[in-house]
């Protein structure tokens, strides 16, 4: 029985992980579908571009990957220390390239708006940034954002 990634990943043991993501119900990720005779080869570039983009945003390096007709293999290196070294501004900038963020985080990113924030609002932004920081070196979030983008 499959186990969730959070119970399989221990960064103290190794920062390198091999992740596999499969298509279901005879769906084709790329290549030619033998049943419908449609070509999905253009999707290979989508997957590659998304991997490169996520690798530049996350504190996760893509060491190797293979995009097969109905699944992908990705070898990842999690650089937790890099994520912990980022400033709050850097974390929010990276997160906002993928997500909208909250009203407070968007205000914080604008220098003229940041000066108007109260101390409690800034504390809230820092707490939110720490959540984002954890996500930006989490393999589950990396794979989620890769697969959701391709599925849509």
What are these regions (language model features)?
Residues 1-152:
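Short catalytic/metal-binding and nucleic-acid-binding patches
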């Amino acid at each position: 029985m499959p186990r969730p990634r959070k119970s399989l990943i221990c960064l103290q043991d190794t920062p390198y992980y091999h992740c596999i993501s499969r298509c279901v119900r005879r769906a084709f990720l790329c290549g030619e579908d033998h049943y419908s005779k449609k070509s999905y080869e253009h999707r290979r570039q989508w997957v590659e571009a998304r991997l490169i983009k996520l690798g530049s945003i996350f504190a996760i390096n893509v060491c190797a990957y293979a995009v097969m007709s109905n699944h992908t293999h990705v070898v990842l290196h999690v650089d937790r220390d890099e994520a912990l070294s980022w400033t709050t501004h850097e974390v929010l900038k990276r997160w906002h390239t993928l997500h909208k963020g909250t009203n407070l985080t968007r205000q914080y990113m604008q220098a003229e708006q940041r000066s108007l924030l109260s101390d409690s609002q800034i504390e809230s932004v820092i707490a939110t940034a720490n959540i984002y920081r954890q996500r930006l070196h989490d393999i589950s979030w990396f794979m989620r954002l890769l697969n959701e983008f391709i599925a849509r």
